[in-house]
């Protein structure tokens, strides 16, 4: 079994570990997909804690210290509460499988397609450095602490979250077909079903 910390989030009487349709009177396709904080937060924190000695062979202490500090970002109840008040259509608490896994599950649960801009997905430099060290894909790294929110007004949702002190960005939109498309500049690829989390390659 994989031995790493797993957080379980409960908000307002229901769990946010699967996509939840919050506002059932609204169509889901054609809405903005908002992501809070940064991808790979939980996995980065776990790797910095469990493999710090190895990381310090290449990186300064400041990198591992900052990465271990990502634990403070793991609670998602504040953004869930703000999203509910600000008209969220659906929410999904990302965990295993990283942002790619979270997006695939979100689309599947809601029965929509996706058009996602990879360059708009927020990531911390510490996550990039640590994933590079262990040869991991940061998009598939344990991402507890980040919430995916579907909303009619993506910019309005981002503004509400930022006013509450929660970093957020619009990373794409839902679509009315089953295609889950990832855009990276002019390059286009399709999102594949969630794979085992990248952290399992290092911590088993």
Per-region residue spans from a language model:
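Helix-biased detector of long, well-ordered alpha-helical tracts
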Residues: 1-204
């Amino acid at each position: 079994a994989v031995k790493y910390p797993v957080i379980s989030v409960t908000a307002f009487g229901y769990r946010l570990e699967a996509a939840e349709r919050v506002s059932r009177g609204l169509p889901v396709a054609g809405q903005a997909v908002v992501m809070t904080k940064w991808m790979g937060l939980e996995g980065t924190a776990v790797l910095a804690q469990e493999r710090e000695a190895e990381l310090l062979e290449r990186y300064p202490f400041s990198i591992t210290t900052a990465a271990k500090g990502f634990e403070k970002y793991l609670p998602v109840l504040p953004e869930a509460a703000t999203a509910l008040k600000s008209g969220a259509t659906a929410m999904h608490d990302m965990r295993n499988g990283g942002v790619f896994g979270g997006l695939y599950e979100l689309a599947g649960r809601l029965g929509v397609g996706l058009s996602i801009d990879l360059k708009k997905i927020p990531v911390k430099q510490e996550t990039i450095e640590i994933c590079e060290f262990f040869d991991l894909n940061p998009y598939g790294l344990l991402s507890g602490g980040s919430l995916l929110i579907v909303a009619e007004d993506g910019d309005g949702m981002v503004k509400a979250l930022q006013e509450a002190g929660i970093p957020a960005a619009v990373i794409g939109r839902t679509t009315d077909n089953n295609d889950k498309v990832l855009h990276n500049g002019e390059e286009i690829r399709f999102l594949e079903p969630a794979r085992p989390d990248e952290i399992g390659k290092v911590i088993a």
